[in-house]
Amino acid sequence: MNVIEGGVAAPNAKIAIVISRFNSFINESLLSGAIDTLKRFGQVSEENITVVRCPGAVELPLVAQRVAKTAKYDAIVSLGSVIRGGTPHFEYVCSECNKGLAQVSLEYSIPVAFGVLTVDTIDQAIERAGTKAGNKGAEAALSALEMINVLSQIES
């Protein structure tokens, strides 16, 4: 029986990080966690990491699609945060962001790691951006690295 599993070291990988500016006080912590993880665990050099900023979570799929279309990158890490308010807007934003990023991954056959927080409160966002609940940006970066290696093994 063959088992394919991916490690996280990918020293030659080119990674794009697409990040929303809205809620930047949270997202910058996610970005720091992602970059640190790519460099320390993935052994990805800084010159192989590109950060692309966009206004909000709704714009992440289009930016990720344009990045994927260039075929310059081995994976995309998407980062952002959507905090529930008093209207249905939260559900629409989260749903469209999630579906759009998944569509990019399938359309371009590239890992698109989901590091977009979808939380009820600012406190939950803070917890997931590097305090009590870890750093979801770092987790998304690990997922991207592992997927690069899994797909590489499948194709070889």
Swiss-Prot record:
Protein purpose: Catalyzes the formation of 6,7-dimethyl-8-ribityllumazine by condensation of 5-amino-6-(D-ribitylamino)uracil with 3,4-dihydroxy-2-butanone 4-phosphate. This is the penultimate step in the biosynthesis of riboflavin.
Residue positions binding (2S)-2-hydroxy-3-oxobutyl phosphate: 86-87, 128
Organism domain of life: Bacteria
Active site: 89 (proton donor)
EC number: 2.5.1.78
Single GO molecular function: 6,7-dimethyl-8-ribityllumazine synthase activity
Enzyme class, first EC level, given as a word: transferase
Listed GO biological process terms: riboflavin biosynthetic process
Phylogenetic placement of the source organism: Bacteria, Pseudomonadati, Pseudomonadota, Gammaproteobacteria, Vibrionales
Cystine pairings recorded for this chain: none
Organism: Aliivibrio salmonicida (strain LFI1238)
A family per Pfam: DMRL_synthase
Coiled-coil region(s): none
Family the entry assigns: Belongs to the DMRL synthase family.
Catalytic activity: (2S)-2-hydroxy-3-oxobutyl phosphate + 5-amino-6-(D-ribitylamino)uracil = 6,7-dimethyl-8-(1-D-ribityl)lumazine + phosphate + 2 H2O + H(+)
Keywords: Riboflavin biosynthesis, Transferase
Pathway: Cofactor biosynthesis; riboflavin biosynthesis; riboflavin from 2-hydroxy-3-oxobutyl phosphate and 5-amino-6-(D-ribitylamino)uracil: step 1/2
Protein name from the UniProt record: 6,7-dimethyl-8-ribityllumazine synthase
One Gene Ontology cellular component annotation held by this UniProt entry: cytosol
Residues the entry annotates as binding 5-amino-6-(D-ribitylamino)uracil: 22, 57-59, 81-83, 114
Subunit relationships: Forms an icosahedral capsid composed of 60 subunits, arranged as a dodecamer of pentamers.
